[in-house]
Curated annotation (Swiss-Prot):
Residue spans crossing the bilayer: 15-37
Name of this protein: Protein OPG162
Taxonomic placement: Viruses, Varidnaviria, Bamfordvirae, Nucleocytoviricota, Pokkesviricetes
Glycan attachment positions: N133
Bilayer topology annotation: Single-pass type II membrane protein
Localization in the cell: Virion membrane; Host Golgi apparatus
Intravirion membrane side: 1-14
Biological source species: Vaccinia virus (strain Copenhagen)
Gene name per UniProt: OPG162
Main subcellular localisation: virion
Biological role stated in the UniProt entry: Forms a complex with OPG162 and OPG190 to coordinate the incorporation of OPG164 into wrapped enveloped virion (EV) membranes and, subsequently, the production of actin tails. Therefore plays an essential role in efficient cell-to-cell spread of viral particles.
Assembly mode: Interacts with protein OPG161. Interacts with protein OPG164. Interacts with protein OPG190.
Length: 168
């Protein structure tokens, strides 16, 4: 094999620097193009289509009116739940969707339950505790209406909003 002289080696070095720079630039540009083309697969949205993202949660207006039992079932099918009565998002949800909707509060046999999981709720921690505590009905369910929790019959039909955490 024939060895190259100093001038030829020097010329190759001078030509290889711009070529290397061009290769680096084309690799970066190609990477950006690939990312933009596949961004939905590489960085999926926190919430699925139709769900509204707010403060690490996804909210869906089902556009259906139904009883509490059916509302809980509908949200479970979507791997979600009804909004809790103690969440600070209730007012925001009302301003976004502008409708009365079920919350997961139910009074049955003088016990206050979260109907998403049938666990007891300490209503003294809720903002309108005094109003809730004055309820004498044996059974009552609640909707969020114009800034407050309002008692209603559990079998009545109301709007259903479902909530779930990001990426579930």
């Amino acid at each position: 094999m024939k060895s190259l002289n100093r001038q030829t080696v020097s010329m190759f070095k001078k030509l290889s620097v711009p070529a290397a720079i061009m290769m680096i630039l084309s690799t970066i540009i190609s990477g950006i193009g690939t990312f933009l083309h596949y961004k939905e697969e590489l960085m999926p949205s926190a919430c699925a289509n139709g769900w509204i993202q707010y403060d690490k949660h996804c909210y869906l207006d089902t556009n259906i009116k139904m009883s509490t039992d059916n509302a809980v079932y509908q949200c479970r099918k979507l791997r979600a739940r009804l909004p809790r009565p103690d969440t600070r998002h209730l007012r925001v949800l009302f301003s976004i969707f502008y409708k009365d909707y079920w919350v997961s509060l139910k009074k049955t046999n003088n016990k206050w339950l979260d109907i998403n999981n049938d666990k007891d709720i300490d209503i003294s921690k809720l903002t309108n505790f005094k109003q809730l505590n004055s309820t004498t009905d044996a059974e009552a369910c609640y909707i969020y209406k114009s800034g407050k929790l309002v008692k209603t019959v559990c079998k009545s039909t109301q709007s259903v909003l479902c909530v779930k955490k990001f990426y579930k």
